[in-house]
């Protein structure tokens, strides 16, 4: 599209990707230049073997706006990714115009430091075979379908199979 830029940023659930915005991209493109970013390790982006931290995502957002969009932009962001955009805006105010937050997670719930149990869990999940096994169990086809039926579907008897497939593929 043509017009002022809008950057779309997906939620940070395991299958999160730019596909989340598919139903509104064309409408937004009638009046805006639309950018749909898959954050590092998500969707169609490379899934390298690094530990993805909040800083990595904040930097990726700022770099994308600077190097790809090249001007102050509006951002529409979903779920857990809201905190990354808020921090990116805090760090580099000149890159952002308006921010629309869809289903934001409470920032106060995100400020907690990991305790001993969380640190142990992280170490266990970083063990190559064990961590991969647990991850694939969490994002198996059945687990994704159940998650959609129980938590995401407006009509659980007629789930959006294309969205489920996109979520599953983005997680793998």
Predicted feature descriptions by range:
Residues 90, 96-131:
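Flexible "cap/lid" loop of the alpha/beta hydrolase fold
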Residues 23, 87-91:
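Active-site signature of alpha/beta-hydrolase-fold catalytic machinery across serine-
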Residues 8-11, 79, 104:
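Glycine-rich His-Gly loop
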Residues 1-44:
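Conserved HGGG/HGGXW glycine-rich cap/lid loop of the alpha/beta-hydrolase fold
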Residues 22, 36-76:
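Active-site loop/oxyanion-hole signature of alpha/beta-hydrolase fold enzymes
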Residues 110-111, 135-172:
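Conserved alpha/beta-hydrolase catalytic His-Asp/Glu region
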Residues 76-85:
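Gly/Ala-rich beta-loop-alpha elbow adjacent to hydrolase catalytic centers
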